[in-house]
Amino acid sequence: MLTRIVVSIVKACTRFAATTVLIALVFAIAAGFYTARHFEINTDINTLISPELDWRKRDIQFDDAFDRDRTILAVVEAPTPELTSSASAALHQKLAGDTKHFESIEPLGSGEFFEKNGLLFLPAADVARFTSQFESAAPLIEILAGDPSIRGLTGALETGLAGIKRGQVKLDGTARPFNLIAQTVEGVLNKGTATFSWRELTSEKPLTDSDRRAFIEFKPILDFNALEPGKEATDAIRQAASDLNFARDYGARVRLTGPVPIANEEFATVADGAVVNGIGTVLVVLFILWMALHSVKIISAVFANLFIGLSVTTAVGLWMVGSLNLLSIAFAVLFVGLGVDFGIQFSVRYRSERFKSNDLQTALEKAAEYSAIPLSLAAMATAAGFLSFLPTDYKGVSELGQIAGVGMLVAFFSSITVLPSLLSLLNPPGEKESVGYAFLAPVDHFLEKHRVIIVVGTLLIAAAGLPLLYFLRFDFNPINLRNPHVESIATFLDLRKDPNTGANAINVMTHSEADAKKIEEKLSKLPEVLRVMSLDSFVPEDQPEKLKLIAQGARVLNPALNPESVDEPPSDAENVDALKGTVESLRKTAGDAKGPGAVAARRLADALSRLADSNEATRNKTQAVFVAPLKVVLDQLKSALQAKPVSLKTLPADLVRGWKTKDGLMRVEAQPRGDSNDNDTLRKFAGAVLQAEPTAIGGPVSILKSGDTVVKAFIHAGLWALAVISFLLWLTLRRVTDVLLTLVPLLVAGAVTMEICVLIGMPLNFANIVALPLLLGVGVAFKIYYVTAWRAGRTNLLQSSLTRAIFFSAMTTATAFGSLWLSSHPGTASMGKLLALSLVTTLAAVLLFQPALMGKPRDVGE
């Protein structure tokens, strides 16, 4: 009955070929207009999982409550903390009034509150030590504040040397500061530029990358009509940095990360090279079609049929799901692969029949008769396989399955309506020779003669590799699907190395202050947790004691920091005299001693001597290198001595908003102990926190939960697909053995594909796991073609036109998949890589294993 229906459709369409093609073109053009008006790609990896899951609901609630899903984080970095502070302040001031691009701008971990109260967040012992050091340095600070010049700098050095002479300071204790100063002076003399940090000079420990970083959080005004909604805002930040001459004046750079820049660059990465790859793919597919069909007219018909079907499928897909995601966009590649497959199968069968009978209409009807069962069964089986993903919580693949499933039906319908009509109108010339592969006769004979060895050997090899599947890795960290070389991701990966940034933090939400304290206490006891923070963390402990120490320091330092008068800037001659005097003092102090302090003193003396002998411009440049950061440090010190009591009521509104919403929802943040870039560390961290607080959310929780969701989705969908396809096959073939002949090679190919993944170290991830349903679709189609031909009594299948069709169909599919492999997007590239691998194993199973498994056909009567 199915054969009669398909043949009748082909007869009707070829009888009214022009009308059929015209209707198809109208549909395709209308679909194209719909696509152009509604085309949208959602590049947010977080949306690949269903928002109906409990943990995703909490994730979305958190993003909405604390406005975390539409921010830009500007990371300002410079060679020294002082330059970083100056550059960050300049950028903040420059953009503070830009209401065109930004709703709000907030420095993170800096600003007036932290500048004034920063000392209160240190342990009381550290506050006592710092204020004591400041008090001891008061004479030096007074000199530098009163005379910020080379003369003042050398005066401070002279004061230090006097302390050495009096025995208050050991000469070897000055080795580090003397070397730092000498290194800076030498840098200006030798390279024309250098940087200097007073904070580094006075610090007992080396500065870290986080000391040289400042953060500004922007909430941009997004243009959702643009493909990159936040591009104007990110461009405004970069333009401001350029206008401020960040690189020249501060030696600084600004890097942008956060949800908005990541989404912008994700789209750019996906689009990068897409046009070139697309054109290249089309050209290669055209070449393969030529090799398969040897007729410009037939190729034109197949290509026109393909694009009509693709246009309709794209429009229907957008109508069904609203916007494509990073996985569902692969439907186009899938449609090209299987759409061309259906076209090639019909066209090669047509060529074979045209060789037997030179009548066009007879050849088309015979092609329809022989293709009806295999094509319709392949279309139904592949559509059923893809639609099996529809009920899963893995939304990315669920939508891919939905679009691809409908696409298979569109491809099948167009292949029995539009394609025969086009062939009827174009009327390709008759075939001069058979379209099979006679040279494969020895292979056919070998497979038939040694079928038992081949079947048993293949099954044994596949079974022997099954233990490897235990080592199959799942990498469900979505950040690994991003391009690590784009600025937003590279910046995020850098920040993730620093636990102070909280890039891999987990949060717990609550409306109760008492519960927040209990949660904080519970999480702080977990060995996997490095630190726990909440709004209460910004109210320092032991404030009375610390404020008393700061007040004592302020009484001593305020006069030094605020001298009654500042000396007039010295002339260049005065600077030279001061330098020469200090050179002499350094050499006298060092004498003939051999210790590190003496060596450093002589090195500094030599550097200052060279500076005295250089020109005025070099001395002015050197003075600026030391004085510019000095002014920053002195201003910071003045602010630090103005600390006031801090309570929850006195915290800045911007700071409070980040931890507590207007309706009283609070968050408690836990940060991981150990390597934050290690997936196992994050999994253990997430598992421990979830065990203590099951409602926790955040990046590591998403990684853990997403992995579970994806694995469950593929197990459920795989079982459903297998069941539905088996039922369809049985319904059509009516023999369990024939169903097994179709499915066993598919299962063997799937197992071998996964085993090879382990051997070559390729983990499954959010993107490339899509290869499994695609393998199901392509694999089932190829195997159905062979089984239906075998049931019809055909022998020597490798020599037949069917093998030609399958081989070149696989080649076009491989080309489509290969174009994904060349993508600059890591997720898409990994998808293409695994697709190519799965196609190789599938083709091997079809061409080599399945003929041996089937053996000689039964009598057609059976």
Question: Which residue ranges define each predicted feature?
Answer:
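Charged, amphipathic alpha-helical linkers/stalks
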Residues: 546-607
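Extracytoplasmic
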Residues: 162-291, 295-296, 584-725
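C-terminal, active-site-flanking charged/polar segments
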Residues: 483-488, 512-568, 575, 841
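Membrane-embedded transmembrane helical bundles of large multi-pass transporters/channels
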Residues: 1-43, 49, 61, 222-228, ...
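Short, low-order "capping/linker" segments at domain edges
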Residues: 116-134, 543-559, 709-719
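Solvent-exposed, non-transmembrane loop/terminal regulatory segments of multi-pass membrane proteins
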Residues: 36-79, 192-206, 444, 448-453, ...
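Membrane-proximal extracytoplasmic
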Residues: 2-280
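Short proline/glycine- and acidic-rich turn/helix-capping motifs at secondary-structure junctions
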Residues: 108-117, 536-548, 701-707
